[in-house]
Design a protein with these regions (language model features):
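Bacterial Sec-dependent N-terminal signal peptides
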Residues: 1-26
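Terminal presequence/propeptide segments associated with secretion/organelle targeting
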Residues: 19-316
Length: 316
C-alpha cells in the first residue's frame, strides 16, 4: 500500500464484520462502496452480512465509510474510538515513528507508548482523509465525447477534471480527486475531508512491528505485530485544523467497535480500504494482451539480459 490509486477496497488490518455462516464460500470480488446496494449487497447478506446497505455506505448518515480513512496518500487506517484513535500497520507508520526517534529516544527500536493525550507526538506532514462521498462523473469529464471516449483529448479531460475539482472543493474545504477506471472509459470523483493534525500514540519495537518486507511478505504463517496507533485531532468545533496545542481529539461520525469474542470458521468477513493499485477491473482483452504479448516480451528481454549480467558478475 505504498502508492495510491483510489478505490475503496482492500484493508490494512484484518477488519471483519463477522457473523456465523459455515456454508459461505469466499467471494473475491472488488467493488466501489457506492455500488454495494445495487451490485452485491443481497449476495453479502446471504453470506452472513447483518449490516444494511445504508450502514455500509451513506452520504446522509454515518456509516462504515466514515470509520475507514486514507492515511497520507499511501495507506489505510481505521478509527476505533469516539476520540479519534486510529489503527494502521507498523510499516505504514514507520516514517512517522522514525521522524520522532532520536539517540536518546529510540522509539523505532524500543517502541513508544503515550500515557496521556499530552504525551502523544505530533507528526508534521502526516494527514488522514475521510471520504465524504463519491460520484460517477464520466459524463462531465468526457462531455461531448461520452459515446466516443477514444476521441477525447487529454487536454480536454484534464480541463474538465480541473473544473470539477474547483466546483466541488468549496474553496478548499474539501480535497477532490477524479480517477479514471477501465482505461479511461469511466471516471469517478472522490470528495474527502482532510485532517492535518495526526499524533503518534503507540508503536511496538521494530523487532515486533517489522512485517518482513518482500522476504516474508507472502509467507504464512507469520507472527509479527505489524501495527501502530495514532490519533486524529480537530479544532474545538470538531473541524479540520492545522496542529495546535488547543486542538482536541476528533469525534468521528462512526468508529469500529472492537470485539474480543474471536472468530469462527465460516464467519462473514469483509475487507475495506485503499489499495495501492489494482488490476481487478482489467477486461478480458487486457488479460489476453498481458498473457500473450506483454509478459512474453518482458520474459524474452530478461532472458537476453540476465546472462550478460551474470557474466559481468562472475568477472567481478
Amino acid at each position: 500500500m505504498k502508492k495510491t490509486l483510489l478505490t475503496l477496497m482492500a484493508f490494512v488490518l484484518s477488519f471483519g464484520v463477522c457473523f456465523a455462516n459455515p456454508k459461505a464460500n469466499p467471494d473475491e470480488g472488488m467493488w466501489l462502496p457506492m455500488f454495494f446496494k445495487q451490485l452485491n449487497h443481497s449476495t453479502m447478506q446471504k453470506m452472513g452480512l447483518k449490516l444494511s446497505a445504508e450502514q455500509l455506505y451513506s452520504i446522509n448518515n454515518s456509516s462504515l465509510k466514515d470509520a475507514i480513512v486514507q492515511m497520507g496518500d499511501f495507506c489505510t487506517g481505521e478509527i476505533v474510538s469516539d476520540k479519534g484513535l486510529m489503527f494502521t500497520n507498523h510499516h505504514c507508520g514507520y516514517d512517522a515513528i522514525v521522524s520522532q526517534s532520536t539517540v536518546e529516544h529510540d522509539y523505532l527500536n524500543n517502541g513508544f507508548v503515550s500515557q496521556s493525550f499530552e504525551e502523544e507526538l505530533p507528526i508534521p506532514g502526516l494527514y488522514v482523509s475521510f471520504l465524504v462521498r463519491m460520484a460517477d462523473v464520466t459524463k462531465e469529464v468526457l462531455a461531448e465525447n461520452i459515446n466516443t471516449p477514444e476521441n477525447a483529448t487529454e487536454e480536454q479531460i484534464q480541463k474538465n477534471i480541473g473544473d470539477l475539482v474547483v466546483k466541488y472543493s468549496e474553496e478548499g474545504k474539501y480535497k477532490v480527486e477524479v480517477k479514471p477506471f477501465f482505461e479511461g472509459l469511466e471516471y469517478y470523483m472522490f470528495i474527502y475531508e482532510v485532517f492535518n493534525d495526526v499524533r503518534l500514540v503507540f508503536a511496538p519495537p521494530a523487532s515486533i512491528g517489522k512485517y518482513g518486507g518482500d522476504t516474508d511478505n507472502w509467507m504464512w504463517p507469520r507472527h509479527t505485530g505489524d501495527f501502530s496507533v495514532f490519533r486524529v485531532y480537530a479544532d474545538k468545533n470538531n473541524q479540520p485544523a492545522e496542529y495546535s496545542k488547543d486542538n482536541v481529539p476528533y469525534k468521528p461520525k462512526h468508529f469500529l467497535p472492537i470485539s474480543i469474542k474471536g472468530v469462527e470458521k465460516g464467519d462473514f468477513t469483509m475487507i475495506w480500504g485503499y489499495p495501492g493499485s489494482t488490476e481487478r477491473y482489467m477486461t478480458s482483452y487486457e488479460v489476453s494482451n498481458t498473457i500473450n504479448i506483454s509478459d512474453p516480451a518482458v520474459i524474452k528481454a530478461g532472458e537476453a539480459l540476465l546472462p550478460v549480467m551474470k557474466k559481468m558478475m562472475d568477472t567481478d
